[in-house]
Structures are given as structure tokens and as C-alpha cells.
């Protein structure tokens, strides 16, 4: 956990003192793992918080240049590493995840300032969680697609995971 946030913090520190990263997760355990990596890598421009993404942090509204929304998903892109995922998937569970993702997106999209970037990512290959959600963000939350969506499909025996990322600009 925290790989995208840590990478963002490292990239920012390479460019000088140009900002800070707030890495949040609902799980104490995952935040502790992120903290271990931050300490190991001696990163100073990142702060971790145990935080429920469904709770709006009023102090961050319209403040962020970039928000990376790496949301809970069905994980269908990592089924090669976690084959038990296929036994837990159902149309109802998938729809429930889409609903949760959209509820979180309604909150975190508010943190992005006008002209800022929302990076939406998942580790699934499910269209409803990916392209459909990204299109919904543009239609319902006032964002514009910036380039093409990127979907990586896991290839047979490649060891690669499937994932999705969309770069969206706030109007």
C-alpha cells in the first residue's frame, strides 16, 4: 500500500520543495505499512492519516493540485495473484463497489482545485468500475477527460496485473 503516494512524494522531492502529499487509508494496518516505507526511504514531504474517504475534509476543498483516487475495487486485474477473488464476485457485489466508488469520488473530487487533476485508478478490468466511472466523473462532477484512459489487461503468464487509470481535469 501507498506505492502511488510514495512515488508522487519522491517525484516532488526531486523537483525541490514543491509541495506535500497526504496519503490516507481507512486501515490502521495499511497506514502503518506506508509509514514503514516512508521511514525506510527517508521521505519527508508525505504525511499519512487513517481516514475514511467518505468523510469530507472541509479544510481540503479546492486546495489540491492533484488527487490520486486509488479506490477499493473488485480486484479483477489481480486475479492471477489472488484467484479467490473469482469466488467472491457477483453482479450485486460489483454494483455495490461501483456505488461505493462513486460515493468516495463525490467527496475527493471536491478537494481538486479548478484546473487541477484527478487521477482515478483501480486494479480491476471491469468496465463499470473503470471507463463508466471515469465518464460519470466527467458528466456528474465537472471534470474533463485529459487524453485517453489507460487500461492494462493482464497477459497470460506475463506476471503483469491488470489496472486502469484516467487523468481528469477539473473544469
What spans do the regions from the language model cover?
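Helix-to-beta-strand junctions that scaffold the AdoMet/dcAdoMet cofactor pocket
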Residues: 13-16, 43, 112-114
